[in-house]
Amino acid sequence: MGASQKNQELIGGLILFSAALLAIVVNNSPLASYYAMLETINVKLGIENLVIDKNLMHWINDGLMAIYFLYIGLEIKREIIVGTLSKPSNIITPAIAAFAGLAMPSLIYLSINHDIKVINGWAIPSATDIAFTLGILALLGTRVPAKLKLLVITIAIFDDIAAIAIIAIFYTKSLSLLSLSLGTLFILAMIICNRIFKINRSSVYVVLGFFAWFCTIKSGVHATLAGFTTALCIPFRENDKDSPANFMEDSLHPWIIYFILPVFAFANAGISFSGISFSILFEPITLGIIWGLFVGKQLGIFSILAVFKKLKWFKLGESFSNLQLYGISLLCGIGFTMSLFIGVLAFNDTHLLNAIKIGVVVGSVLSGFFGYIVLRFIVTNPS
């Protein structure tokens, strides 16, 4: 990771945090009525009977986040072909650690929340916000070796793959087979353009991907799946910086960290304290998310990394201390944007959403703070 990219990750993390803080301030000020317009102003896209009519909040969650998952898909494709995921030995331990880091928070959430009305939120504390995590890693600088950062990114990649699967399987509320079939045809068209006709023009995949996204929204399946599958269809050529996948990933990166994720954070993090008492911190859904992110994530990930290192099944881990592995396990509990995203898919009740936002913010802050403390002040020999 070059110096300029480190600076981008650091600045991006600070902007993301500022956007979330601004949302809370605005939604608890005289400007709150303007903030509410995110859910009252509708925008239409389409012609005649082929129209998508959604409010600004939905456009951010269905549109901008689809672009974010397109970017995630491009990153994953590159890592599979030429990166860390191209070697099976580098895949097994981070994949199992990511799964444990998904399962443990979900189990903690379900152990606290028994009401059928809130069980649907089990996946909220299972996510990791890679943008925030990379921002803290950039802040730590040389205190975190490059290989350790690579391990965090690899775990986060598997976390993202799991999040996409969870959203597609568990948070699809209705299904139009016709629209889904049409979306699949556009995906197949991209595969044909790539594999058979060897078309390298990015614009072709942008247009076909847009129609795949449009049909996916109409089908009822969440649009993030269209973004991810589109990325997998875009040509990637090894040692060719101008291949469509490389070009699009490089082009999207600044938009993701400086615009898309901050806008999402601003739109979704606006906790309104009006009518909320301190007791909301102790509601089961809030506690389930806090303990899931802060305890479940670190417990699931660190237990796998430490055990596999002890058994010598994790060669990369032999160069790290247990404290370093524990520190990054803590950082993986920063759920923030991804947890908020799953939360707004799971519920639409205002009180529940406020409880979710508080739980996500508290759990993420605890994870980020203590992860930073461990890696910055407690680890004695970072190299």
From Swiss-Prot:
InterPro entries: Na/H_antiporter_dom_sf, NhaA
GO molecular function: sodium:proton antiporter activity
GO cellular component: plasma membrane
One Pfam entry name: Na_H_antiport_1
One Gene Ontology term from the biological process aspect of the record: regulation of pH
Keywords, comma-separated and alphabetical: Antiport, Cell inner membrane, Cell membrane, Ion transport, Membrane, Sodium, Sodium transport, Transmembrane, Transmembrane helix, Transport
Topology relative to the membrane: Multi-pass membrane protein
Chain ranges passing through the membrane: 10-30, 56-76, 91-111, 121-141, 150-170, 174-194, 206-226, 254-274, 289-308, 327-347, 355-375
Catalytic activity: Na(+)(in) + 2 H(+)(out) = Na(+)(out) + 2 H(+)(in)
Record localization: Cell inner membrane
NCBIfam families membership: NhaA, PRK09560.1, PRK09561.1, PRK14854.1
Family: Belongs to the NhaA Na(+)/H(+) (TC 2.A.33) antiporter family.
Function: Na(+)/H(+) antiporter that extrudes sodium in exchange for external protons.
HAMAP family found in the cross-reference section: NhaA
Name by which UniProt lists this protein: Na(+)/H(+) antiporter NhaA
Protein encoded by which gene: nhaA
